[in-house]
Amino acid sequence: MAPLRSPHDSTTQLVLQTIDAYERSAKECVARWSKRRHRRPPLLAEWLTHLPADASLLDIGCGGGKDADDLDRRGYRVVGVDRTSALLLAGRRRYRSLSLVRADLRSLPFQAMAFDGLWAAASLMHLPKPDARRLLADLCKLVRPGGLFAATVTYGMKSRLVTDGWVPGRYFARWKKDELARAVRRAGWTILELNVVTNRERKGRWINVIARRGG
């Protein structure tokens, strides 16, 4: 008799498929991101208004390091973390001064209260929702009291593995507004902003959230 598979097995497989997709497409991803005119996303700009000028920041799912480099150039102390080796290698070659760490987002290797702010642009959406909920609670422990978290996730009803597009094979968890709000609050955050927006560059509707750790 074959051993029973737990729900964790299937969610892990979705994460691994997404990582593999980025490993295969890393060069294309970095080239595409680097060609874009780098305009600071409005959510990022808003998040930074709440943070001190010398804040210690973690870029969660940093990919090739473009956002981390933007923050580093503006004087923040930045660490980027991602699971995809090829993206990190490209980032280290392009941005030699950056601290880029390879780690699974579901098991981050940082000490409690190590950061003032956490930035997660289009990264939590690649985790199945049970994993994302656990990560939200873990992230709350990584920031100091009063620390800020900002994230973008895909909006909608259906989560699915996308087999087409410019990086085929990625999993996308789509969230409803009230569903994400509940998950963020239950993880210990106080929501400052949570809005559904249309992103013309990435196409489609997204949820932007900024939240603060109490205490």
Question: Where in this protein do the model-derived segments appear?
Answer:
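Short alpha-helix
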Residues: 172-187
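Conserved S-adenosyl-L-methionine
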Residues: 189-200
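Conserved class I S-adenosyl-L-methionine
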Residues: 2-52, 157
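Conserved beta-strand signature within the Rossmann-like core of class I S-adenosyl-L-methionine
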Residues: 146-153
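A short glycine-rich, Lys/Arg-flanked "PGG" loop and its adjoining helix->strand segment in the class I
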Residues: 133-145
